[in-house]
Amino acid sequence: MIELKNLTIGYQQKNNEKVVASDINATLHSGRLTCLIGANGIGKSTLLRTLSAFQSPLAGEITIQNPSHAPILISARPMTRSQEKVLSRLIGVVLTEKPDVQNMTVFELVGLGRSPYTGFWGRLNNDDKQIVAESLQLVGIESLKDRLIQTLSDGERQKTMIAKALAQQTPVIYLDEPTAFLDYPSKVEMLTLLRRLARETEKTIFLSTHDMELALQIADELWLMTKDTSDATDLIIGTPIELATNGSLSHFIDRPGIHLDPKTLTIKVTNCQ
């Protein structure tokens, strides 16, 4: 479980702070697929980077429950090396960028997920290799294990990066736009896979996406970043049905000619002639 308490996210700009969103209080639960949605530029990437400890919060804190040790706290205070090492065994991150690797096989790249345990240049023992093989199997790409990364399709490459995160054996996986650049069937397959992994492995899986209708159909929970009446960024949390019923999704989605059907959770386009 991950708890956000009075969290303020943003950037340090010379002598002042650029606040993106403040007073965020929320909880991410294990065994669920949670999708972060919202307009371009509203701060989804900033929130994801803060959760991943790639940048520090401006205020507040993030508490990550640790099955093996004491909880890890992410705050404005810099983390120690020992805390960073523990964090690498708690959080796996899958980014949108293509991996900058050449002449590396799928098995070798997924094997890098074991580096928190072996060191970056560490050799994989038999247990590590078994974990890599199981990760490939969970994602359904065991037949690709000997393929070079540069020969993969976008969908195959994305599955490889997810397998790498699984091989890291973290209880938490964050993904930034995992369905970007995929065709529609591959988008459905990817989100369905992530939901299945969350449920089967009891992991906390949290991702940002612009694939609104798929998120409505597949996510267990939605985090909707939106602007309130005072133009401050607000975070609305609930199941797709809950956010459809209370009008939050319609307020975000509906435009002239674009309408959310709250009963079917589908987006309808009219007057497109």
Regions found by a protein language model. Give the residues of each.
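ABC ATPase nucleotide-binding domains
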Residues: 241, 251-273
